[in-house]
Regions:
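N-terminal segment of the mature soluble domain
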Residues: 21-70
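Charged, low-complexity, helix/coiled-coil-prone segments
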Residues: 34-40, 64-80, 118-125, 171-177
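Short, intrinsically disordered, charge-balanced linker/junction segments flanking boundaries
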Residues: 240-241
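Intrinsically disordered, low-complexity boundary segments flanking structured domains
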Residues: 11-12, 54-59, 94-100, 198-199
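Amphipathic beta-strand/beta-sheet edge segments enriched in Tyr/Trp
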Residues: 68-121
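Bacterial Sec-dependent N-terminal signal peptides
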Residues: 1-24
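C-terminal/domain-edge helix-coil "capping" segments
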Residues: 106-107, 111-237
Length: 241
């Protein structure tokens, strides 16, 4: 939870720059019955990102909205070779654009490519190498996702803000901020999102400040004056407390 809040704190300090340019979408790690190697996962991400850029979508390392690729094998065969067997299969890539906080799905796209190699991972790599960022199926998918995201938040903005407030009221500030950060800056009424982000973050600041002060008081009452001072030095100077 603290890690989430730290990430959101960093985002908050620069959200005007980040979101002024439009929609940001992350590319999540692939999922499926087969565990990809790190290199193969990175290869798929690198192959797909140009399709997002081509469609005017900014990519992000961290975002509530993400494209989740699911990989499965169709018509899988293992052909005996000389020294090593050759794995061949139709590799099915199911790309899903979703809000990770609400599980709202905006768009999906299935692309099937033939792959082969000396292992399942090699077969997937071979299939990935055949993917093209200019593939109309991929660019149409990203464009559809972009339009659906804008439409969703435009029509559900008040509901999103209300849900964020509900999270804040039960002190789940990270979840509340994550919802608000997923709103594109291009929608009308985004000023309300900006204001709510500031309000919830200040609530979080106040809670953290009070917690630190309580710890400092405990250390002080126990005679641990240096420890008390160290706690007080952790207080955000912009906090209201």
């Amino acid at each position: 939870m603290r890690k989430v809040l730290l990430t959101l704190t960093i985002l908050l300090t620069s959200y005007a720059t980040i979101f002024a340019q439009g929609i940001e979408i992350a590319f999540a790690l692939p999922v499926g019955n087969y565990q990809l190697s790190d290199n193969t996962a990175k290869m798929l991400r690198s192959k797909f990102l140009p399709a997002m850029t081509e469609s005017g979508v900014e990519t992000a390392e961290v975002s509530t909205i993400a494209i989740k690729p699911e990989i499965s094998f169709v018509n899988k065969q293992v052909v005996e070779g000389g020294m090593r067997n050759i794995h061949t299969s139709d590799i099915q890539f199911n790309f899903i654009c979703t809000n990770l906080a609400t599980n709202t799905t905006f768009a999906s796209c299935v692309v099937t490519v033939r792959g082969e190699g000396f292992s399942d991972d090699d077969a997937i790599k071979n299939a990935i190498s055949k993917l093209s960022a200019q593939d109309k199926r991929l660019t149409d998918f990203v464009n559809k996702a972009k339009d659906k995201i804008i439409d969703y938040y435009q029509h559900n903005l008040n509901s999103v803000i209300s849900r964020a407030r509900t999270f804040a009221n039960i002190q789940q500030y990270g979840e509340g901020l994550a919802l608000l950060f997923s709103c594109p800056a291009t929608i009308s009424g985004y000023t309300k999102v900006n204001n709510e982000i500031t309000t919830i973050y200040r609530q979080y600041q106040t809670q953290e400040c009070n917690n630190v002060i309580q710890k400092a008081r405990t250390e002080f009452s126990n005679g641990n004056f240096d420890a008390a001072v160290e706690y007080l030095q952790q207080i955000d100077m912009t906090s209201s407390c």
